[in-house]
Amino acid sequence: MYRLLCLFCFSGLLVQSQVQQLDEVVLSAQRLKSDIQPLSATIVSDSLNLNFTQEIGGLLQQIPSLFVSSQQNFTQDTRIAIRGYGARATFGIRGIKVLLDGIPITTPDGQTQLDHIPLSQIGTIEVLRGLSSGLYGNASGGVISLQSAPIISETNIAVALGDFQSQSLMAQWSKAQEKNRFRAIVAHQKQHGYREWSGFENTLVSLSNEFDLKNSSTLNIDYSFFNSPYAYDAGGLTLTQVNENRKQARQANLNYNAGERVQQHQLSARLETKNWQSYAFYTRRQLDARLPFVYGGQIDLGRDYFGLGTQTSGTKNKWLWQYGIESAAQHDARIRFENNMGAKGEETLHQNERFYSLGAYGITEFSYLDWRLRTALRADMHRITLTDFLDTNTGKKDLAAVSPSIAIHREFSRFFSSYVRWGTGFETPSLNELSANPSGKTGFNNALEPQKSSETELGILFRKKKFDASLTFFYTKTKNEILPFELETFPGQNFYKNIGQTTRKGIELEGNWQFAISGNLTFSYSRGHYQTETKKELPNVPKHQFATTLQQHIGKSTLALHTRSVGARFADNENKVPVPHFWTADVTIKHNWRKSALVIGVNNIADTQYFDNIRINAFGGRFYEPAATRQAFLRVVVSF
C-alpha cells in the first residue's frame, strides 16, 4: 500500500530511471540464460540509486502498453495493466505475474499485493509484455521481475515531507563480509491524503541474509513484516460530485467507515548452485476490511500462501535448456459480516477456500549462425475447493492447461535484429472473484470460467552506443474474457462474468538516447485497440500512452523532467461513459553533498485535473476517483 507519498517523496529517483539496452544484460525474467531476448521486454534501472524508492507504479509508467492507476487509493493498492491484462483488478494487481528474486509474489489464483516489498532494496526491474504462461503458468498476461541490489556495507537514513501531511522515515543498514552478507530495512509512512477519508499509516521491516556455501553455491534467507493499522477508502464519485468538490469522499464510505487493516509476514529461502536453483516460501496475510454496504460489508480474510520450486539449466554445443517444476497452495479463510454503519453485525458468509497449483515446464533454445529458435511448453493443474460452513455449497473444481510458445530471432548485424513470437496464456478466476456470487448465496459462482488467450508478436530492435530503440506489433485473442460489474442490490461490491471473445492489437515504441555525456532522454509510445466481439473497447484501458524522461547532470546536481500522456478510455462495457485524456509533468532537482543528498520536487506541476482510478461498471455513475493536483515534496538522504 505504498501510494501517493511515494510519488511525492521519491520522484527524484523515479524520473531518473533508465531503460537499458537489451543486449547489455541477460533477462532473468525469461528464465533461460540467453544473451538475446525474443520477446518484448524492458529493463528499468537507475544509474544513480534506487534506494528509498517505494511505489513501483511510478517506476513503470514509461513502459509502453503498461498502464498504472489507483496509486492514491491506499485501500485498493496500485493497479497495473499490461496490454489490458490486469485492468479489471479490484484490489492490487491481477493477471500479471510478479516475482522477487525469482520467487513468486503472485498467489496461485493470480492476485498480487506489493505493500510488503521495500523497493529501496531493488536494483533492477524487468518487465515482459505479452502472454507468458509458457514460462510462469496461470495469470501471466505479463511479467514483472524485481531483482534485489547487491548487498554492500552501508547505512542510509531518509526523511521526507510533502503536501497532504505526508511523512516518511526509512533506515537501511547492511554489512558485507567475505562469506556472509546482511541487510536490514525499516520504513514508516503516514499521510492524510489528498481526498477526505483517504489517509493511511504503515510500517515495514525487511531482513535479508546471503551465505556463500561450498562449490560456488549461495543460500539466501529473507523475512519481511508489514503492518498497516488503517487505510481509508474515499470511494468513487459521480461526475457531478467531482465538479462540486473533487476532494470529497463518498458519503456511504464515511457512513460505513470504509477501509482496511492489514498485517503480513513472509519468509523465503533460495538455494543456487552451478546448474540448479531452488526456492521455498511461506506468507501469512490478515485482512480486515469494511465496505460501504450492509450485507457482507465487513470482511475477515486470513490467507496462508506457500510454495516451492526447483529448476535445472544446461548448455551443450548450440543448445540451451531449462526444466523446472513448481508447486503452490493458497488457503483463504473468508468470513463476511453485516456492516452496520461501521459496526460488525451478523455473519453472512463463512467458508474456507483452497487453490492448489502444480506446474512443470521446459524451455529450449537452438542457435544457428545468426538465427535463434526458442520453444517453451508448460503444463499446469489446479484444484479449487470450497468448504461452506453456513450452507451446503461445498464443492471442488479441477482445471488444467497446456501452454506452448515459440519464437524465432534473427541478428542481421550488431546494430539491428528482429523476432517473431507466438504464445498462449490462461487465467483462472481468483478465489475473490469466485466467492463474489451475484445470486446472493454463499459458495462459488460456478458460472465463471477461465479465460484463454493466444498472441502473435513481431519485434524490431535497433541499438548503437548512444541510442537504442525497439518497435513491437502484437495481436491477441482471448476467449471468455472476465470483467467486473455491480448490482443495484449490492452497490459498491464487484461481481464478475465472462463476456465472450476479445481482441487486443497494437504497436509499441520505446527508445533511449544519450545526447550528451551528462544528458539522457528516454521515451515510449503505445497505441492499441482492446475490443469485445461487438467492437466495444475494454473499460479502463487507454487507447494510447506517451511518456518521456529528460535527465541532465550539472556538477553535483541532477535536473529531471518526466512527462506522461494517457489517452481516452471508457468506464463501462458499453462505452457510454468516456474518460478524458490527461497529461502530467513532474520536475525534480537532486543535489549531492558528500554522503548526503537533498531532493526537491513538484509533481503534476501543471496542476492537471484527472482521475487516479476508474471503478469499472460502477452502479449509480460512481466511476471516478479524482487524482491529486499539484504537490511539492522535500527529501533528505544521509549515508554513513
Where are these regions (language model features)?
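Surface-exposed extracellular loop regions of Gram-negative outer-membrane beta-barrel proteins
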Residues: 240, 329-340, 381-388, 396, ...
